[in-house]
């Protein structure tokens, strides 16, 4: 009986620990999310629209704000206060942001 209770407790603990983990971004879904970004950002070439081209973004040393190109800094830019680009913090879900970043990493 004790063994059963311990096993159930361990299974519950593992389930709760895994439930909080975010899913990895999905490239195909990220491409769809990017459609909202495409009026201002280019991914086909290096030409600038209203915002910078995002082609090869994760191959660059720095973002336009001077910060190093990392997933965290790109997510922070997506969540920006709206001075440099529209404020997407409350528009896109965390999963959509992860999907978008996964897509941008393929460019």
Which residues are covered by each model-predicted region?
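Ubiquitous "structural anchor" signal
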Residues: 14-17, 38, 59
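Post-cleavage N-terminal segment of exported redox proteins
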Residues: 1-26, 77, 103-107
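Extracytoplasmic electron-transfer domains, predominantly the class I c-type cytochrome c fold
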Residues: 32, 48-50, 56-107
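Sequence/structural segment immediately N-terminal to covalent heme-attachment motifs in c-type
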Residues: 23-47
């Amino acid at each position: 009986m004790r063994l059963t209770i311990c096993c159930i407790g361990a299974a519950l603990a593992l389930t709760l620990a895994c439930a909080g983990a975010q899913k990895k971004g999905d490239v195909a879904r990220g491409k769809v999310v990017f459609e909202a970004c495409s009026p201002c950002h280019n991914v086909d070439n290096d030409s600038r629209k209203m915002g910078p081209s995002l082609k090869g973004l994760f191959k660059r040393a720095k973002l336009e704000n001077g910060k190093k190109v990392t997933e965290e800094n790109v997510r922070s830019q997506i969540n920006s206060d709206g001075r440099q680009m529209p404020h997407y913090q409350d528009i896109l879900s965390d999963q959509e942001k992860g999907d978008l970043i996964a897509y941008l990493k393929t460019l």
